[in-house]
Amino acid sequence: MKFEILNKFLIKSLKKVNNLITRNHIFPILENILLIAKDNTITLTSTNIDMEIKIIILDVTLLEPGSITVSGKKILNICQNLPKDHNLKIQYINNKLKIVSHNNQYLLATLPIKNFPNLKISENQNNFVISQNDLKDVLCATYFSMAIQDLRNFLNGLFFEVRNQHLYAVATDGYRIAICKKPLHNLDKKKYNSIILPRKGVLELIKLLNYSNEVISINISNNYFQIEFKNLIFTSKIITEKFPDYTSLILTHISKKMILNTTLFKEALSRVAILSNENFRGVNIKNDQNKLLITTSNQHDEEASEIIDIIYTNIKIKMSINASYMIDILNAIQDQEICLSKNDVTHSIQIQAHHYKIAPKAIYIIMPLYA
């Protein structure tokens, strides 16, 4: 294997594949990246068994094809400490990977490719396309509601389903739920698989996605979730458990509601929450005519209260909520005004953008600490 490449192109790709690499004393091969040189391209692959990132580099001068695995962290550190505009000469020779840059030379240990894991997606796939913009929107609107290491494993990820010509993303930790949908175009009429993408896969995907109109392909099988970009493929195992029904929790016909300024509500909550109980982060909200009272207290007999104006209301709300949950939602809503409505059956509170039809279509539900 022998090729030449401009350092800045190699660094850009090495950074992405290194996201999956951590210290691994049991399987040292997982600290390596798979490097394949063929057909005038270089392919870099990293994996942690549960996820895989594969990047194809076209800006390369291939002199001799070949493949090997090499430490991902070491090759990245070397390249980052060399000038970005240097042309690198890379060659596999005598079981070492040789990197030459002007008068500098480095020899890295390698491992054979036969032991490098390969995530094989099954043939039974559902495929559809979506823009990077739309996919990143639904992820950023929902990911913060995923559970963290819950015993109910189906909560430790993001639920995806294709329904009524839309992609739905749903996350819940049992105390709150986030739902966002985006329209899909040119869909077949076949039934699409619903899957749960694990938390780590969701967070990694958010890093990889850009706010771009570039169309990407989503492939869903019985065991994997895969995204294909122009020169990058991200694959993740899925959680093979049933996600709970969430549709019955949503208020579809909202006649009674409260409209608040998003920024004013968020800033007041942030200040009041400073003196809330550190474990429960509880704040009380209560409206009186066109004013909303936000109060809290803690075990040290400290108290805080603020009053903000209500833009419009025809309901009475009096409940205690987790301030951090509400602030997460307010940070995600891309509208100057929010709409609060109360579900009298579940005693939950539903939050969404007031201008729902033009803002990203996301709905949030929070269970009260006590009503």
UniProtKB/Swiss-Prot annotation:
<dbReference type="GO" id="GO:0003887">
    <property type="term" value="F:DNA-directed DNA polymerase activity"/>
</dbReference>
<keyword id="KW-0238">DNA-binding</keyword>
<keyword id="KW-0808">Transferase</keyword>
<keyword id="KW-0963">Cytoplasm</keyword>
<keyword id="KW-0235">DNA replication</keyword>
<dbReference type="GO" id="GO:0003677">
    <property type="term" value="F:DNA binding"/>
</dbReference>
<dbReference type="GO" id="GO:0005737">
    <property type="term" value="C:cytoplasm"/>
</dbReference>
<dbReference type="Pfam" id="PF00712">
    <property type="entry name" value="DNA_pol3_beta"/>
</dbReference>
<keyword id="KW-0548">Nucleotidyltransferase</keyword>
<dbReference type="InterPro" id="IPR001001">
    <property type="entry name" value="DNA_polIII_beta"/>
</dbReference>
<dbReference type="Pfam" id="PF02767">
    <property type="entry name" value="DNA_pol3_beta_2"/>
</dbReference>
<dbReference type="InterPro" id="IPR046938">
    <property type="entry name" value="DNA_clamp_sf"/>
</dbReference>
<comment type="function">
    <text>Confers DNA tethering and processivity to DNA polymerases and other proteins. Acts as a clamp, forming a ring around DNA (a reaction catalyzed by the clamp-loading complex) which diffuses in an ATP-independent manner freely and bidirectionally along dsDNA. Initially characterized for its ability to contact the catalytic subunit of DNA polymerase III (Pol III), a complex, multichain enzyme responsible for most of the replicative synthesis in bacteria; Pol III exhibits 3'-5' exonuclease proofreading activity.</text>
</comment>
<comment type="subunit">
    <text>Forms a ring-shaped head-to-tail homodimer around DNA which binds and tethers DNA polymerases and other proteins to the DNA. The DNA replisome complex has a single clamp-loading complex (3 tau and 1 each of delta, delta', psi and chi subunits) which binds 3 Pol III cores (1 core on the leading strand and 2 on the lagging strand) each with a beta sliding clamp dimer. Additional proteins in the replisome are other copies of gamma, psi and chi, Ssb, DNA helicase and RNA primase.</text>
</comment>
<comment type="similarity">
    <text>Belongs to the beta sliding clamp family.</text>
</comment>
<dbReference type="InterPro" id="IPR022634">
    <property type="entry name" value="DNA_polIII_beta_N"/>
</dbReference>
<dbReference type="GO" id="GO:0009360">
    <property type="term" value="C:DNA polymerase III complex"/>
</dbReference>
<protein>
    <recommendedName>
        <fullName>Beta sliding clamp</fullName>
    </recommendedName>
</protein>
<dbReference type="InterPro" id="IPR022637">
    <property type="entry name" value="DNA_polIII_beta_cen"/>
</dbReference>
<dbReference type="Pfam" id="PF02768">
    <property type="entry name" value="DNA_pol3_beta_3"/>
</dbReference>
<dbReference type="GO" id="GO:0008408">
    <property type="term" value="F:3'-5' exonuclease activity"/>
</dbReference>
<keyword id="KW-0239">DNA-directed DNA polymerase</keyword>
<dbReference type="GO" id="GO:0006271">
    <property type="term" value="P:DNA strand elongation involved in DNA replication"/>
</dbReference>
<dbReference type="InterPro" id="IPR022635">
    <property type="entry name" value="DNA_polIII_beta_C"/>
</dbReference>
